[in-house]
Each structure stands twice: as structure tokens, then as C-alpha cells.
């Protein structure tokens, strides 16, 4: 009698990150006899921890797309081959191609996210339709914006794209100097009316505060969507989500894409079993079924368009789909991840010190040039 296969997986430490994978694992084990033990890492570690180190300890790893250039150099992940058409065609927005790099597919999207708008439906009649409305709410002390690294840079990316000049991922200059400076000025003007604690907060911290009855925050114009907070009774106050506010008449285009994909370690002793689970959990049946029911934020359109999935989440998916479909893929070259952290910290320091927008965008562009492969 053969020994049952037990895989090890690593995901991120939030109910959205681990509960759907645990639920899907239970279904998979019942069907195929393969178990998976999931460990977790903090959100900050998730964005910065070396993937190669994880690949030497785990069979399955949840990653985000800016890592793909680094993992290609490290040769620590196994590229997916074979029939992936169902997953590719069902991908929401650019989620599937965001993990395609140098001719190979390094992960399969299981979670789709981008910067959208969060709001309090118990106190606002509708989400803020445009940036002028956001500014008016901010002057009343009713707006927050997560600015802890890397989210400060994500806001800059999104605003620059909304102004008509998305980041140039191939370089050499990441931001158009004039548009980048305009985006920094927009950020600075907003942050003057926002509690400075936001410089220390990531999206989860903002949501946890916003979902309390006595919180003053009614609108967060740019924040990575978390479907859990749109559920009834997840927190004391149920939040609503919408497309990001319009800026300059261009609609909800250019939001900095987030989300996660599932990858297979090149060092796994059970490659076939790991690949089989990854392909199943990223496809339609699992995504709109056990993955969504357990609190996941699926990456497959079958879930985003499903009536039952939307009903449970206050129409989260339909309300933010246009922003997700118009989202922008961040740079992914080897060397990008250190840049992302350094540029985020540099941006916050410049905003807090009152440094000129032109000087600040020039320095961020300098950091980006230095990160590019030679």
C-alpha cells in the first residue's frame, strides 16, 4: 500500500488567503486522497520574502505577479504547461497574463484584486463618483488612504495612469515627469486632509477601522478590494465597494493590479500532484464553488459573474469589475521588488517632508533606472 501524499503549501495570513485554500484542500483530499498542509506568512512578508527560500520548503506557493522576473532567474518555480485554455480564457482582467513571463506561465491566478473604492453604505447614498467628491469628503475628515509600503506607490501608479500616462514598465523612465508630478500633487493635497496614521496602515488596517460603528471614515478612494468586508456580519459594519472614482474623465482604467497566483516549486518531490491541485483550484468549478464559499476572492470570471457569489458579497464583483478589467500590470523584471519597497518609502518621506513633486518623481525614476537589468 502506497504512502498517502501530503503536500506543503504557503499562503498569506488573512482569512481571504488561507480559508479558501483549506476548504478546497478538504474537497481535493476527499476526491483524490492528496492532503495539503497550509502555512501562512504575514502580508508584509508576502510582498517581500524571497520566493526561492519558500520553494525549498514548500510544494505549492502563493505569489504575486511582480515576483515573476525574480523567480525566473532563480529557477525555483516550475512553469505550467499543457491545456490551460479554460483558466486563461476565464481570467478576470489581466490576472492570467500577469504571471506570464519570458514565454512561460509561472503561476495560475486564484485571487483577483486591484485598487478600487470602499465606502460606508449606511452613511453615503452612493460611492464617490469622482475625485472632486473625494476631496470634499476628505475636507470633512471622512476619507482614509492606506499608504504603508508598497501602497503609497500603488496609489501613485493608479493616479498617473488615470491622468493618461501609466508607468512604462520597460523603462528607462517609469513615470512621465509632468504627469508623475501631477499625481504626486494630487496625493499630497488629499493627504493634507487625511489622518497621518494612514502612512502606517495597509488596506487591512484601514478596513478593520472603517468597519467599526464609531469610525468616521466613509470613503477610501483607492484600496485593494477585500471581499470579506462586503459580507454580512464579517465585521460590525458591512462595507460596500465600487469602481474607483473618475479622474480627468477617463473612467476606471489604470488601477495597479494585485491579486495572487498559485505556483509549484521546482524542488517538489510531488510535482504531478502539486500541478493537478493548482490547475483545479484555479479553474471555474473550484473558483465559483468551494473557493468563493469559503471567503476567497476568485480570479476566474465564472465566479465574478455568478449570481450566488455576488449575492453573498453585496455585489462586490459586479460593482468593481470595470476597474479590474482596466487594471495595469506592474513591472516584473528581476530587481523590481527591492525598487517597489524603496520607492514606496521614498514617496512617503517626500510627501511628509513637503519635498517638491518634480524632485520626488525624478528620484523615483532614478531608483527605477537603477533596478533595471543591465
Report the location of each language-model feature:
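Short, well-ordered beta-strand elements
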Residues: 3-15, 34-40, 60, 143-144
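Extracytoplasmic "Venus flytrap"/periplasmic binding protein-like
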Residues: 33-91, 218
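Hinge/lid segment of periplasmic solute-binding proteins
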Residues: 66-116, 126, 241-242
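Extracytoplasmic/periplasmic solute-binding protein
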Residues: 108, 115, 133-173, 179, ...
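Glycine-centered hinge/linker elements that transmit conformational signals in sensory
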Residues: 171-202, 244
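Extracytoplasmic/periplasmic substrate-binding proteins
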Residues: 193-269
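Long, aromatic- and glycine/proline-rich binding clefts that accommodate carbohydrate-like moieties
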Residues: 292-342
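Conserved C-terminal helix/tail region of periplasmic/extracytoplasmic solute-binding proteins
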Residues: 325-374
Amino acid at each position: 500500500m502506497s504512502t498517502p501524499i501530503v503536500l506543503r503549501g504557503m499562503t498569506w495570513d488573512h482569512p481571504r488567503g488561507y480559508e479558501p485554500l483549506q476548504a478546497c484542500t478538504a474537497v481535493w483530499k476527499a476526491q483524490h486522497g492528496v492532503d495539503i498542509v497550509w502555512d501562512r506568512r504575514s502580508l508584509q512578508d508576502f510582498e517581500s520574502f524571497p520566493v526561492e527560500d519558500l520553494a525549498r520548503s514548500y510544494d505549492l506557493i502563493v505569489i504575486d505577479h511582480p515576483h515573476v522576473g525574480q523567480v525566473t532567474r532563480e529557477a525555483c518555480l516550475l512553469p505550467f504547461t499543457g491545456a490551460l485554455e479554460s483558466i486563461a480564457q476565464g481570467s478576470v482582467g489581466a490576472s492570467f497574463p500577469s504571471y506570464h513571463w519570458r514565454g512561460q506561465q509561472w503561476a495560475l491566478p486564484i485571487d483577483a484584486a486591484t485598487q478600487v473604492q470602499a465606502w460606508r453604505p449606511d452613511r453615503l447614498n452612493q460611492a464617490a463618483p469622482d475625485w472632486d467628491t473625494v476631496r470634499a469628503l476628505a475636507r470633512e475628515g471622512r476619507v482614509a488612504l492606506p499608504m504603508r509600503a508598497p501602497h503609497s506607490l500603488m496609489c501613485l501608479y493608479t493616479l498617473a495612469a488615470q491622468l493618461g500616462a501609466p508607468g512604462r514598465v520597460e523603462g528607462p523612465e517609469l513615470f512621465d515627469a509632468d504627469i508623475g508630478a501631477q499625481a504626486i500633487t494630487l496625493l499630497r493635497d488629499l493627504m493634507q486632509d487625511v489622518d497621518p496614521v494612514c502612512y502606517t496602515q495597509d488596506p487591512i488596517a484601514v478596513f478593520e477601522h472603517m468597519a467599526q460603528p464609531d469610525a468616521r471614515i466613509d470613503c477610501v478612494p483607492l484600496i485593494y478590494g477585500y471581499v470579506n468586508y462586503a459580507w454580512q456580519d464579517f465585521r460590525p459594519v458591512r462595507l460596500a465597494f465600487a469602481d474607483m472614482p473618475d479622474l480627468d474623465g477617463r473612467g476606471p482604467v489604470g488601477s495597479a493590479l494585485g491579486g495572487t497566483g498559485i505556483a509549484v516549486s521546482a524542488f517538489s518531490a510531488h510535482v504531478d500532484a502539486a500541478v493537478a491541485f493548482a490547475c483545479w483550484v484555479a479553474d471555474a468549478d473550484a473558483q465559483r464553488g468551494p473557493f468563493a464559499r469559503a471567503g476567497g476572492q476568485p480570479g476566474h470570471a465564472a465566479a465574478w459573474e455568478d449570481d450566488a457569489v455576488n449575492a453573498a458579497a453585496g455585489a462586490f464583483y459586479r460593482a468593481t469589475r470595470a476597474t479590474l478589467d482596466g487594471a495595469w500590470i506592474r513591472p516584473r523584471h528581476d530587481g523590481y521588488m527591492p525598487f517597489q519597497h524603496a520607492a514606496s518609502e521614498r514617496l512617503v518621506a517626500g510627501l511628509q517632508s513637503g519635498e517638491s513633486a518634480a524632485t520626488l518623481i525624478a528620484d523615483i525614476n532614478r531608483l527605477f533606472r537603477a533596478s533595471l537589468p543591465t
